[in-house]
Regions:
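Active-site-adjacent structural elements that line small-molecule/cofactor binding pockets in enzymes
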Residues: 1-321
């Protein structure tokens, strides 16, 4: 099983993120990816800086937002990173959500259509095609895999037909299995070899020896996802419908504390990793037994520990070697 790290780029400084790169590589982790939030941070530029600091580590975005950049400029950035770090870039793409995109002033379009158009444009530029009448962009010297973020099962299926890999996030083991099945079935139907298309699972991680403290941090983090319909629907379909109903009612009443309390321990233990290092290692093994082949851990702030401090602890106590 491959074990990597993904950093929430908007929750730590650019220098902090880049300074974590070499320790991550030296500890034997498989990858270091960057989360990008809408108009909050630049995950692609951060990945480029990490590329210049490392020599073996797989680097990339988890994800770069497809609404924020012209796809030709995204392709140019990817080619630049690949020249600095040959065959080490994974370009993860995703849409975030309608509310954030429209609030930022962008037009929301069908996300699967945007993913397909962006992917086709990226591949054209990588192959040396440019825009008529403009200077030719640099082509890619190596294959640059394009992975899609998938929340809806329909997006997972579309990724199987069009992308080079799938990036999943806060999935229960059962939901992970359904998503991967749809992804691989669609790949097979499209005449592709699903065995050559990797699937990663990003798992928010909260390291603390005091279990209640870790659980509280996880609830504070997860409650904001549970209020979004697409995440609530996924959690409900994974056996947590009653909890999602309680969260919705509490949010409707403006009661954040009750909404957090509605996220029971069973849900937390299915979608995040929390507690002592030994407990988290047991959780990693549990996901591996469920068929997860590539886990990327997402350190989060816990109590007085910042995200950067949690990442440092993660590198020290959860290193693959």
């Amino acid at each position: 099983m491959r074990l990597g790290i993904t950093l929430w780029g908007f929750a730590l400084g650019y220098r902090e993120a880049v300074d974590l790169a070499r320790p991550t590589e030296d500890a034997g982790f498989h990858n270091l990816f960057m989360v990008e939030s809408v108009l909050s941070n630049d995950g692609v530029t951060t990945a480029a800086m990490i590329a210049a600091r490392t020599s073996r580590l797989l680097i990339g975005t988890n994800i770069a937002n497809v609404y924020l950049r012209h796809p030709v400029m995204l392709a140019a950035a990817a080619v630049a990173i690949d020249e600095i770090a040959p065959e080490r870039l994974v370009l993860g793409l995703g849409p975030n959500n309608r509310a954030m995109i429209t609030q930022a002033g962008f037009t929301w379009r069908d996300p699967r259509e945007v993913l397909q158009v962006t992917t086709a444009t990226l591949r054209a530029v990588f192959a040396g095609q440019g825009v008529a009448g403009l200077r030719q962009p640099r082509s890619a010297s190596h294959v640059i895999p394009i992975h899609w973020a998938g929340m809806a099962l329909e997006t997972c299926a579309a990724a199987g037909a069009h992308a080079d890999g799938l990036m999943l996030y806060i999935n229960t083991p059962a939901r992970y299995g359904r998503a991967v099945e749809r992804f691989r079935r669609a790949a097979t139907e499209a005449g592709r070899d699903p065995g050559r298309l990797p699937v990663s699972l990003l798992i928010p991680t909260f390291i603390h020896d005091d279990l209640p403290t870790a659980r509280q941090a996880a609830r504070e983090f997860l409650v904001h996802y549970a209020r979004w319909p697409h995440y609530a629907k996924t959690f409900a379909a994974s056996g947590h419908a009653a909890a999602m109903e309680r969260v919705a009612a509490a949010y409707g009443a403006g009661d954040l504390a009750t909404a957090m309390a509605a996220l029971d321990d069973a849900l937390l233990d299915e979608v995040v990793l929390l507690g002592s290092p030994s407990r988290i290692r047991e959780g990693i093994e549990r996901f591996a037994r469920a068929g997860v082949e590539w886990i990327t851990l997402g350190p989060q702030a816990v109590a007085t520990d910042s995200l950067a401090r949690q990442a440092e602890r993660m590198i020290a106590v959860l290193a693959p070697r």
